[in-house]
Each structure stands twice: as C-alpha cells, then as structure tokens.
C-alpha cells in the first residue's frame, strides 16, 4: 500500500442546526444511566484454574504491594462468581475486573451484583445457588472491602485490614468515603493509562448519575476534600522522585476529571476557596490545587497568577526560618518548587525567558531532586540559545524510573497467571480451556452457540459482549477479534499483537529494533528526547553533536583515551579537565536520537515505497518522535487504511486534541477525518468494555465546541459505519456533554 499523503478534503454539505439540547432525539433520552444495566449484563468471564484462586492471589498481591512500600493505587476491583456443577459435584469460579462502581456504601455494589445475578441464564447442570463477591481496595487505610452476595439474596460486608491481616473491623462512614475516593481515583487513572489495564476489565462511567451536574459536583467535592491526604495516594514514580502536593494520583485524577467537565472549573475553584476557610490548617493543599487546575486548563491565566502570587509570597518569606533536616520543611520546599515550576512554565509561554530562568534556578535550589525544576531550567537555556548550559542541566537531572514499581508488581502477577492469549491477528488458536472447563463456562452462558463462544475466548477469558453497546460490524466482527484488547505495557505499538510473520516481513531490521518494548523511551526519556529535538530543530544534528563534544567526556571516549590523556609533564590537559562526564543514560539517548533521525531521513527519501500496515505505523511513530508532523500523520493514516490500527488512531487523535506547540500552522487533520477515527475508537473501546472513555469525551467536547453539537451529530450520522448500537453510546456521551454545557453558574 502506498503512503496516504494528505490532500485537501472536500467538505460535505453541513446540515444546518442550532444548539443541541438533551432530549432532542429519541435515542438521546436514554442517557448513560439506562446503559448501565446493559453494561452489567455484558461482562467478560475469566475461568479460574482452581476454585477461589483469584481471591487468594489478590490477598498475596496486596501483601506484596504493602511490603514493597509502594501500594500505589492498589489492585483493581474484581467480581468473583461461585458456581456448583451439580453433575460433577464440583465448585468452579469465574471473575472479571471492574472500575467505576460507586462505593460510598454497600448499596450500589449490591445493586450491581443483583443485576449481574438476575441476568444469568444458566443450564440445568449448574446450581442456582450462585454466590458473588465484589472486592474494592481502600488505599488510604489499606483495607480490602469485600461484599458477598449470597444465593438467598442477602449480603454481608467484610473489611480486611491488610496491615494486621484481621477481619473484625466495622465499616464506618469515614472508611466508606475513603473507599469511594480510592475507587474514583483508580477508575480515572486506569482509564487514562492503557498500560495499567488487564484484559477482562469492565470500565463503568463512574461520573454518571440521575443528574449529571450533581454527580460530577459530588466527585469534585470528594476529591477536593481528600487533598490533605493526597500524599497517601501514591504517585507515578516515572514522573517524580517522590510524592508531592502536585505529583500524586489524587491531583492527576482531579486534573483529568476537570478536563471533561470544563464548565465546572468555577465551581471547583469556589469549593476549594470555601475549604481554605473551613480548614485553614490545610489551606496550602487547596490553594495548590487551585493553581494546578487553572494552569492545566490554560484559560484563566490572570486568576492563576493572582492565586499563585498570594500563595508563594508568604511561603518564600518562611524559607530562612524552616528547620533543617525536617520532613515538614522538605515537603514545604517541594511544594514551593512545584509552584515555581508552574510560574516558570507561564513565563516561558509568555516569552519572558530571562525572568523564567531566575525563577527556575530558585526552584532547582529548593528541590535538587525535582525533575521538573531541572527540566524547566534546560528549557530556559534552550530558549536563550545557551545550548551547552541546557545540556549541563539535562545531565544533572535525577534519573527517573522507566517503569513504575507499582505497575511492575501488578503486571508481573498478571503475566505469571497466564490467563490471556493474544490472537495475533487471527493467526493462532487462542482458545485455551479443557473440555470440562468449557462445559462449565457454557453452562453459565446458556444461549451461546459453541463455535461462536469459542471464537470469543482468549486463553481463559471469554470476551463476550452480547448487548453490543457501541457495535459496528467493521470493528467488532473483524479487527477487534483479530487483535484483541490493546492494553498493558506492550500497547505502545502492534508488534506484539500481529502475526510473527508480519513482523518478520519487515525488511528494515532497524525499524523493528527502534520500536521494541525494550527501546521504548518511557516518560522521563521522552521528555529529555523532546529537549534534544528542540535543539536539533534550531541548530541541526551536527550542531548538537559539536556542542556535546565540547561539553562532555563520553564514557567510551574516557576509557579509550585514559592511557593517553596525561601530557608529558604528567598533567591532564585543561581541555579535558573542563569537560564533564556524560551520564550513561544521556549517552544512550543521543544514540537513540541519531538512529531515529537516520531512519526518518531514509524513509523520507523513499516515499513511494510500499509497506505493510505495521511498517507504516512504526514509521509514523518514529516521525512523531523526530517532529516530522506532516509525514507522521501521513504514515499513521496509511496504517489505518491498510487495517484499522488502534495505536495509530490514538496517536492521530492526540495530535488533534493537543497539537504540538512547535507544529506549523497547517491543518493536518480535518474534522471529518477526526470524526471517522473517533467513531472507530469509541466502537473498539466499547467492544472490550471501556464505557468510561475519558479521552474520547475530551475529543467529543472539542468537536462540539468547534462545530456545534447539532452539526457534529449530523456528521456522525452520515458516516457509513453508523448503526443504532454505536449511536446509543455516542448519543449518551453527547447528552452528558450537553448537560454540562447547560450548567447554570452555582
């Protein structure tokens, strides 16, 4: 297939229409809340090898996380279903993962279990005495809450104290609120990070209730109230050396939720202001949250700077009086550093590079282990064209982890369980159950034909979805079955999801080598890579290489020259003494950048070559890294023409949602293309039980703002793949957005 070069798209005749309001079409009236029952009736099933082992494994996983000192988000919620095969007199179990169930008390989980049980259509050889157990981890107090729903429709709640390994706790209102906050934070972080998702996960829209605005306000209030305990929520260790008031999962969640509820920003700020008066001891947490949110939305800069100055000035005046080697002092200095980083970013965006440099220097002095401070310092030097100083700042940065410790523990457990088997683009048998296990499974799914059920079993996971919310034939009946769910640490590209033969057919070995999991940059390396690319963009690769040679003594250079570096007088020459030793990770990054630039140059000189869909995807990802935006879009679009590619689709939609700041003023993606891609992505996500879709909601919100919701909906209806099943989901999402857009100021 030839490269899909961008061309001017003919605009379709737009159907005129006014503002969209909830209820202006019959399917919209259903709303999200009416989808929940169908969602609960279309859950995956993971077959246990030994009865009850998922609960046993969960207990041991929690122990491992606690003993590691990094509980993080804790394990994802699970639902376990206990059955009895009457003929064999043998118990067997099924389970699946779930997020987004409201756990402010036992009522909603019990209702969820009731719906799940009532939807069961079991065969005669399976006993009706089904027992269901819902588990949710409270990471504030290290409690695992387990709600057991018995065959006689009674339930009991057990709180396991994972620190003491006791079960004699009585759930209090405070514990329930902690559990609810834990589940909301986990739902948001999991939904926005594909690498955290295990196959067999159902993601419910936690933000949906009978009243959209009230439900969203309730979540915002909940997260804001827990800000003083945000340091107990864990953090992403790939982005920060330690948890700070800004860098923690609670703050990440609050920012992500505000991104899909922009009309509630004023409400959030007012609520936080109220908390500063009600709880003045913790006002620094609430004020920092206000600043972080306003900085994140980038539309209320004056308000942000006002609150920032009001917060920073008194803090900076305390610096000389802070006791040394004190934990509270360290936390306060980290907070000041975080706020100064926000100020630096604001000044850089305003073009005030000199003042930004001064602020960044202060931030770095306050927190020498702050990546963000050193990163901003390097940015300031690059803007001032002081490239050698920028490289020195980069070389001085604390090296962050490539993989988060919490994620590594979680995923290693999943890999050892060996429950999931990839279909590899339909090239291998992915059904992995014994005859008895299949009999038991089909006994709990009575209405499924044997061949059709086996087709939807991936290893030991039955990925059935009979209610077909979000269904489109081209996605569900074809590529979704061939590729399976794209999730986990390998979801950065399709190398591990297509057939081995397709990978072998790629002629350019370097293209594969640069895109293996081991060669993925990670968040930390990706940020540094971006700084190096900014320098390359200004002075070219040779210019960067010359500055590197003048500034650094590379490791290989040091060992090669160690015998010859001393002059005839026994002294080390001044030229060598002036050089700094280059960190090994930075040396490796220079080599990675060189390889990518070389590959992109070769590809650009061979635009007429034909490639497979996977090759176009991998080329597109390299073009993205090397800032060839137009070529990246062309490659990724061509990949999707060859075969719908969820990875390429996600990258293209990211470019539309958050265009790179250095992108040229050219429209790389028209709205018709975006709409077509978004429909496919919504459908793919629904196929594997993602009904939360925070990223897709952001895209719909942006399209609504650009086109108007009425025109957008008409454009969606013109798409060839549109049917009733996908429109139910899209209409629910549009209705939710419309409800928020019609928010009356509180």
From Swiss-Prot:
The keyword Cell membrane does not apply. GO terms for cellular component: cytosol; exomer complex; membrane; trans-Golgi network transport vesicle. Residues 734-746 are annotated as: CHS5-binding. Gene3D superfamilies: Tetratricopeptide repeat domain. It is found in: Golgi apparatus, trans-Golgi network membrane. Pfam families: ChAPs. Its main location: Golgi. It comes from the Eukaryota. GO terms for biological process: chitin biosynthetic process; Golgi to plasma membrane transport; protein transport. Disruption phenotype: Abolishes CHS3 localization to the bud neck and plasma membrane, with increased protein localization to the trans-Golgi cisternae. It is a peripheral membrane protein. InterPro entries: ChAPs, TPR-like_helical_dom_sf. PANTHER family: BUD SITE SELECTION PROTEIN 7-RELATED, CHITIN BIOSYNTHESIS PROTEIN CHS6-RELATED. Component of the CHS5/6 complex composed of the 4 CHAPS proteins BCH1, BCH2, BUD7, and CHS6 as well as at least CHS5 and GTP-bound ARF1. The complex interacts with the cargo protein CHS3. Present with 1180 molecules/cell in log phase SD medium. Member of the CHS5-ARF1P-binding proteins (CHAPS) which mediates export of specific cargo proteins, including chitin synthase CHS3. Belongs to the CHAPS family. This is Chitin biosynthesis protein CHS6.
